[in-house]
């Protein structure tokens, strides 16, 4: 099968499309024929070998296969798999999604609704679950709250705007002026152009700040949080930060939070079948719409990763494998 691989960390030029052996599923695993995949910041950081936290967690590259988000059709299942069978259309997360076939744990998959295209389904897993869990589980969002989304026009942000509106919140989106029309079309009630205004110095107060840019520390955001407001960080790994700077900032924020009625939470999304199914149902109903900026083929993955590295994508970058 064809797959994107790399043997050393570096820029997108380290990626190559090669013929490798088709994998075989273990007990709890599913082999899917990949119809579409999507690019995440995680893929870019792992390829580059930075920020430093990724070198600590994943080590240096030997032979690695990028890609996490996937959607496709089940080709084979392991002997202990009970939830899926050959021929089922599914979406979820795996390692090595930028390939014609991928192995996926059955716990990281959900059925793909019939009316949802594979590319739309592939755009959802990491980004939509980050938005959902950041708002609902960690941000404890409630109807009528004022919610600010910093980094609102990216993959997670475009889902977060829509989900916050579904939850009944008033949404302020922070993005560049060229993305104002997009975020308003997704439901944002107010838009702040970060080049013209710093939300942390404004007069508005927010019950929840979902920070996807990682450029406003908790100590700064406290000024615009309500007395029991919550600052949820899901973009703290942005940029080439050293381990000492990264952990120093997190420890400082968590200590401030512990002795304040205002709270700081940092998290990484946990993929699970229940949340994936909920997202799939929302997309199928038309209440939640994946925003796809650009589409690429498998051999164009280096180009997609290069664009990801500009941090200017509006929504998601999708890799199509149906051609």
List where the protein language model places each region.
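A glycine-/small-residue-rich N-terminal strand-loop-strand element
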Residues: 47, 70-94, 170
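Glycine-rich phosphate-binding loop and adjacent beta-alpha segment
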Residues: 216-288, 321-323
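C-terminal capping/lid region of NAD(P)-dependent oxidoreductase domains
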Residues: 280-281, 285-294, 302-323
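A short acidic, Gly/Pro-enriched loop at the edge of an enzyme's catalytic core
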Residues: 201-208
């Amino acid at each position: 099968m064809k797959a994107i691989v790399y043997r050393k960390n570096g820029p997108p030029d380290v990626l190559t499309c090669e013929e490798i052996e088709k994998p075989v599923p273990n007990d709890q695993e599913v082999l899917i024929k990949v119809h579409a995949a999507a690019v995440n910041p995680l893929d870019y950081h792992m390829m580059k070998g930075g920020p430093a936290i990724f070198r600590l967690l994943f080590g240096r590259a030997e032979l690695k296969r990028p890609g996490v988000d996937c959607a496709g059709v089940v080709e084979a299942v392991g002997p202990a798999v009970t939830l899926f069978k050959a021929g089922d259309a599914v979406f979820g997360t795996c390692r090595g999604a930028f390939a014609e076939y991928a192995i996926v744990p059955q716990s990281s998959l959900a059925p793909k609704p019939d009316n949802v295209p594979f590319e739309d389904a592939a755009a959802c897993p990491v980004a939509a679950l980050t938005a959902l869990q950041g708002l609902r589980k960690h941000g404890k969002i409630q109807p009528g709250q004022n919610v600010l989304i910093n980094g609102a026009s990216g993959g997670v942000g475009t889902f977060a705007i829509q989900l916050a509106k579904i939850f009944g919140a008033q949404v302020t989106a922070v993005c560049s002026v060229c993305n104002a029309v997009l975020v308003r079309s997704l439901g944002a009630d107010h838009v702040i152009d970060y080049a013209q205004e710093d939300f942390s110095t404004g007069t508005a107060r927010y019950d929840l700040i979902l920070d996807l840019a990682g450029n406003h520390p908790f100590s700064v955001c406290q000024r615009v949080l309500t007395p029991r407001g919550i600052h949820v960080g899901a973009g703290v790994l942005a940029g080439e930060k050293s381990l000492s700077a990264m952990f120093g900032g997190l420890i400082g924020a968590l200590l401030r939070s512990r002795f304040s009625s205002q709270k700081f939470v940092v998290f990484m999304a946990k993929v699970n079948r229940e949340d994936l199914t909920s997202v799939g149902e929302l997309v199928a109903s038309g209440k939640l719409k994946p925003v796809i900026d650009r589409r690429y083929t498998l051999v164009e993955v280096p180009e997609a990763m290069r664009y990801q590295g500009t941090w200017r994508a509006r929504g998601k970058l999708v890799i199509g494998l149906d051609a």
